[in-house]
């Protein structure tokens, strides 16, 4: 066992960063010997099952012990980190303990970092930005690499209407919002838009996935009250936190996927939905303006604009053939431009650049 790259996931809660790592590991392990430390992920288990010779679970102490020496070929080992505490650890190993390692960081934030994260990022050997905007806030960006979606994990069903029927929920087609339940994700914007639209479209039912933490109890309760008052409790349904293996099924179940956050660094859910054959309506934040092609794979609306979201959704609901066409076009776009394999290749390019420096 001598992994060339050590990938860290040192956060207990499953986040968007966790989702990215989860999707990448089985692909990266097909070409690289990887050591993985931190909270376990389904993607790590899959990588271990598919590539047992290339994928290794490590404790932090095992990873540190391995990193005291260079690889047998004389090259430095790479640590790929994505969070501030992970940068702090690896900078200490390299600069204080003088370990022969190279550090790569992925930055998605679309704002100027505070002074301490800026200093941490400045100490990296390589920086991957997930969008050109993210790169504009990180002077030492090595390469822009867009996130990708797994075309194997996220696949379209044969028929969206048939897929919806298996849910047991009312109506003939579904519209969904995926991710955490909180104000920044725009859950309330989605609920308000659905209250405007659903009474005119009895064939549609809305679902909302994701966890509401204790801090969002009042926020969730206010939405529940709005939904009950509107008489739509059976047609705007909170599914709660889904198991990882259930998420692809629910993308298959819905015909339209909405992503309406007030702010998003990148936002992977539209890619997963498009790979699953959904038409997508998204707000103009994150990487959505790069991903969604208005009129072809979905529609884009201003952030925090309930009326604009309602109009865009109503436009799609009025023409199911357009939904189907957009779903096919979305799958084709992810295949051509935003596959997880393309992301993995971009990351591998950065690893090579860092090792050659």
Label for each model-derived stretch:
Residues 315, 322-337, 343-346:
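A short, well-ordered alpha-helix in the C-terminal region of glycosyltransferases
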Residues 166-185, 191-195, 207:
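Conserved donor-binding/catalytic core segment of Leloir-type glycosyltransferases
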Residues 294-295, 299-307, 315-321:
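Conserved acidic donor-binding segment of nucleotide-sugar-dependent glycosyltransferases
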Residues 279-283:
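Short hydrophobic beta-strand element within catalytic cores of glycosyltransferases
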Residues 262:
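Aromatic "clamp/platform" in nucleotide-sugar-dependent glycosyltransferases that forms part
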